[in-house]
Amino acid sequence: MNQEAAETARESLELVFRMSNILETGLDRHTLSVLIALCDIGLNPEALATLVKELRRDSATTTTTVD
């Protein structure tokens, strides 16, 4: 990746991260980067969103059960 493309990617990720914070998604930069990469290779964004929600629900259930 050339320097200009790398800078554009960093700026795009920063913008997505800011939007994520405004929407209070709780997703960090790394997670957002992985989700963007998965979308770039053709995975359905709605399916990914559903998966993230399910994983959070499962995590909350596990945390509640352990406490």
From Swiss-Prot:
Protein keywords: Cytoplasm, Cytoskeleton, Microtubule, Nucleus
Location (main, coarse): cytoplasm
Signal peptide from the UniProt entry: none
A Pfam family the protein falls into: MOZART1
GO biological process, one term: CENP-A containing chromatin assembly
InterPro entries associated with the record: MZT1
Subcellular compartments: Cytoplasm, Cytoskeleton, Microtubule organizing center; Cytoplasm, Cytoskeleton, Spindle; Nucleus; Cytoplasm, Cytoskeleton, Phragmoplast
GO molecular function: histone binding
Annotated GO CC locations: gamma-tubulin ring complex; microtubule; nuclear envelope; phragmoplast; spindle
Tissue: Mostly expressed in siliques and flowers, and, to a lower extent, in leaves, roots and seedlings, with highest levels in young tissues, meristematic cells, and the vasculature.
Consequence of gene loss (knockout): In the gip1 gip2 double mutants, embryonic lethality and impaired development of male gametophytes, severe growth defects and sterility, characterized by microtubule (MT) misorganization and abnormal spindle polarity, resulting in ploidy defects.
Iron-sulfur recorded as keyword: no
Assembly and interaction partners: Part of the gamma-tubulin complex. Interacts with GIP1 and GCP3.
Family: Belongs to the MOZART1 family.
Record's function text: Required for gamma-tubulin complex recruitment to the microtubule organizing centers (MTOCs). During mitosis, modulates gamma-tubulin complex localization, spindle stability and chromosomal segregation. Necessary for gametophyte development and embryogenesis.
Record's protein name: Mitotic-spindle organizing protein 1A
